[in-house]
């Protein structure tokens, strides 16, 4: 099971992280999930991409922020 992930809006993700200092390391991570539907005698699957900002705080704790927006999968 995946760990809990904080969900933020696009605007929140683009704003400076007030709780973390300017020395914080952040990387963009991508997760692809598949949405499948059964049609007739076969499954039709489409990818759904989710983006996360993975940040390491000064105390070495890691936090993931979802930054997926409406344009990510268009």
From Swiss-Prot:
Keyword terms: Membrane, Mitochondrion, Mitochondrion inner membrane, Transit peptide
Locations listed in the record: Mitochondrion inner membrane
Pfam entry (one): Mitochondr_Som1
One biological process term in Gene Ontology: mitochondrial respiratory chain complex assembly
Coiled-coil blocks: none
Other facts: Present with 358 molecules/cell in log phase SD medium.
Subunit description: Component of the mitochondrial inner membrane peptidase (IMP) complex which at least consists of IMP1, IMP2 and SOM1.
Function description: Non-catalytic component of the mitochondrial inner membrane peptidase (IMP) complex. IMP catalyzes the removal of signal peptides required for the targeting of proteins from the mitochondrial matrix, across the inner membrane, into the inter-membrane space. SOM1 facilitates cleavage of a subset of IMP substrates.
Name assigned to this protein: Protein SOM1, mitochondrial
Species in which this protein is naturally found: Saccharomyces cerevisiae (strain ATCC 204508 / S288c) (Baker's yeast)
């Amino acid at each position: 099971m995946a760990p809990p992930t904080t969900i933020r809006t696009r605007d929140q993700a683009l704003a400076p992280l007030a709780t973390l200092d300017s020395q914080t390391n952040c990387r963009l991570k991508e997760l692809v999930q598949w949405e499948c539907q059964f049609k007739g005698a076969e499954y039709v699957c489409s990818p759904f991409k989710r983006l996360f900002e993975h940040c390491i705080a000064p105390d070495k704790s890691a936090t993931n922020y979802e930054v997926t927006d409406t344009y990510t999968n268009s």
